[in-house]
Regions:
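M16 family metallopeptidases and their MPP-like homologs
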Residues: 1, 37-48, 74-169
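An aromatic/glycine/proline-enriched structural segment found at the starts
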Residues: 1-48
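Secretory-pathway/luminal and periplasmic proteins that interact with or process carbohydrate-rich
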Residues: 5-12, 69, 147-152
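Short amphipathic alpha-helical signal-transduction/dimerization elements
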Residues: 7, 64-68, 119-127
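Short secondary-structure transition/capping segments
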Residues: 31, 57-65, 123, 135, ...
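Active/ligand-binding-proximal structured segments within catalytic/core domains
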Residues: 42, 52-64, 71-74
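Short Ser/Thr-interspersed hydrophobic loop/turn segments at strand-loop and sheet-helix junctions
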Residues: 68-69, 81
């Protein structure tokens, strides 16, 4: 009486938005009088989460900044003592994503010198690649995360729904 059959509506047409390529570096500074400690942040546009590159960026992010034994943390916080904190993460999205690297300076260290240190470590990783041991650690970590995410019924349901919705798999 109150709830009848609801007829199926027309299929939803999803729009695909294409953004113009970023062809130049964009620098911006923002200051908040309530914040006493500056942060240096570098952000890059990345490909869709549906690409292999998105998974590679997740591994690179973990290698560079996950934990106190990561490359950037050891270099900038422990060895050179130019930063209080350094981190990186890949924020993958359905169309485009962002790869973000940030650091909090120690003392009067400039943003430019922090970015220089970060860039040097990225170039070092590109030219020398990573050791077999570090690669094995990364593989173990990601495999462990995958298994852990499927250890509960809730985790399995979330993964099935996500993979079906985003990847059609």
């Amino acid at each position: 009486k109150y709830f009848g059959a609801i007829p199926k509506g027309a299929p939803v047409a999803r729009q695909k938005f294409e953004e113009a390529p970023i062809t130049a570096t964009i620098n911006a500074t923002w200051e908040d009088p309530n914040v006493q400690l500056p942060m240096t942040l570098a952000a890059y546009r990345t490909p869709s989460m549906k690409t292999k590159d998105a998974r590679v960026l997740d591994m690179i992010s973990s290698y560079l900044s996950d934990g106190k034994s990561s490359k950037l943390y050891k270099k900038m916080v422990d060895e050179k003592k130019v930063a209080l904190q350094v981190g990186a993460f890949s924020n993958s999205q359905e169309d485009y994503g962002q790869y973000i690297i940030y650091s909090l300076p120690l003392g009067d260290v400039s943003s430019e010198s922090l970015l220089k240190e970060i860039d040097e470590e990225i170039v070092n990783m590109q030219t020398n690649l990573i050791s077999e041991n570090d690669f094995q650690k990364l593989q173990n970590k990601f495999e462990n995360n995958y298994v852990s995410s499927n250890a509960t019924v809730e985790g399995i349901a979330e993964n099935l729904a996500s993979y079906y919705l985003l990847y059609g798999d």
